[in-house]
Amino acid sequence: MDFQAEYRSKLRTPAEAVRAVKNGDWVDYTSGLGFPPLLDAALAARRDELHDVKVRGNLCAGPVQIVECDPEQAHFLYHTWHCSAYERRLCDRGLCYFCLLYTSPSPRD
């Protein structure tokens, strides 16, 4: 099978792709402009089927549908590696958790 045929055989719609997500899973969204809005919307549509799904993003400009559709955080918890302005506002509302990505040595006294 050539690469293009193999690639086409693996293509899925966002709704088909998020069927793989189970309770308790971690899902990683990509960073910034690579944010997957169609996948995010498809995952948000499964809100009532899922519990304790944790999602990590990074510099997402917003909106993040899994956060907006579940302000009680009964189904999804959203974490960010580095806050965009939108994610900082989510943090201020208690709807986003910051994951410390980088630590550097602190000066000794």
Predicted regions mapped to residue ranges:
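N-terminal active-site beta-alpha-beta segment that forms phosphate/nucleotide-binding
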Residues: D2-H82
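Short, charged beta->alpha transition segments
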Residues: P14-A15, Y86-E87, S104
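HKD-type phospholipase D/PLD-like phosphodiesterase module
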Residues: D70-L100
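Conserved small/polar residues in nucleotide/adenosyl-binding loops
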Residues: Y102-D109
